[in-house]
Amino acid sequence: MNEELQNQFMALDVYNQQVQKLQEELSNIDMMIMELLRSIESMEGLKSSKEILLPLGAGAFIKAEAQNPEKIILSVGVDVLLEKDVDEVIVDFQKSVKELEETKELVNTQIQKTNQEIVKLRSELEKRAAAIEQRNAQMRPKTN
């Protein structure tokens, strides 16, 4: 196999790895969006009921009542907490969801472009393989 052909096979492998990483990134983005949407839903729920489920760990919860549901305490860094109004946090989370959706679109576009390159490269490799096969067939001695 000549060097150019080897390079094309390596490029194909790299493209496939890129698509896989981008798909993993999409999955992570989806999980972040879902977490933000659940948080927004929970904060909206605090407006009608102060009752919350407090996680204890290992899938166990206890019913509790929020003392001050108008304020949310956010972790903004290592050992740094910030208190904000619930409506302000909801708006911030909605902005984050929108930004993540935009990022998701960019990642999907990149996946499409990379897949187009994969299709193009595979087509080239198939043509070359067919040409090599034809050349080899012509070089074989014919038997009667």
Curated annotation (Swiss-Prot):
Quaternary structure and partners: Heterohexamer of two alpha and four beta subunits.
Species of origin: Methanococcus maripaludis (strain C6 / ATCC BAA-1332)
Family: Belongs to the prefoldin alpha subunit family.
Function noted in UniProt: Molecular chaperone capable of stabilizing a range of proteins. Seems to fulfill an ATP-independent, HSP70-like function in archaeal de novo protein folding.
Matches recorded under SUPFAM superfamilies: Prefoldin (SSF46579)
GO cellular component: cytoplasm; prefoldin complex
Gene Ontology process terms (BP): protein folding
Name of the featured protein: Prefoldin subunit alpha
Localisation: Cytoplasm
Origin superkingdom: Archaea
Gene that this sequence comes from: pfdA
InterPro entries linked: PFD_alpha_archaea, Prefoldin, Prefoldin_subunit_alpha
An example molecular function term from Gene Ontology annotations: unfolded protein binding
Keyword terms of this UniProt record: Chaperone, Cytoplasm
Top-level taxonomy: Archaea, Methanobacteriati, Methanobacteriota, Methanomada group, Methanococci
